[in-house]
Amino acid sequence: TKDLVLIARHETELSDTTDVASRPEFVDRKRTKDVEGRMVTGWFAEDFTLAEIRTLRARERLPALRPANVRFDGLYQVPTFEEIVALAKAKEAERGRAVGLYPELKHPTMLMEQAGIDVVDLLAGALRKAGLDKAGDRVFVQAFEVAPLQRLNRLVEVPLILLISAEGGPYDEKNLRWADMMTPAGLAEIAKYADGIGPYMGHVLAADGTPTRLVADAHAAGLKVHPWTLRKENFFMAPALKNSGAPNAPGKLAEAVALLEQAGADGVFTDDPALVVPALRRR
């Protein structure tokens, strides 16, 4: 936020995940800005204080694909990172088992360049304050950028994951391309500052569902592999894993889980842990 509080949203632009666009008191905050080479119009978290963010209410980001979820629109506030840590610790005490955290640093270089906000330092400080900055703590930190992870590697001991998009390259390293970084030589470089990669699902499973070489090459470099994002809807599935029906109809989720396991993936990002975890346990 503008007053340097870490909050949890899918991106810094707020209109997809909150009701900010319907708030007349914030109409003057709407602007168009360059977000890593794309011109985006909307309301941005870095222009709001936490007190202002507190007045907003969350809403479903993908209502066309998940119409059932809109019944929750307007019920919840935007959580801070500190509140999520507190929730995880409360659930640990309640359930008697460890609960992990997997925060992502979104647009760290852009936020530093445009707003002077150092989210790397803020997150490192928040992890230390929570007692979650050591190698044995159940925390991974992920980012799509190189230099922020390199800095974080010097500030905390928790494992770090370099996220990899479908195409292009990291925003903070204009001369690097993801394709080159996924070669054995590129993966060896990543291993100097990160503990794993979080690749786009299509880099791990081809369109026909067969595994690529990426997991094996990453493991050879000593890296974990956590692909993203396994979602239940046809819309997000590889062609071989789609069922008949509309884009929001369920795809072949259990088969996707099996293929990822066969590929050797060490974990997976999912919007549907209530479906994916049982599928893993059945195997």
Language-model features: where?
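Phosphate-group recognition and catalysis centered on beta-loop-alpha active-site segments
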Residues: 1-283
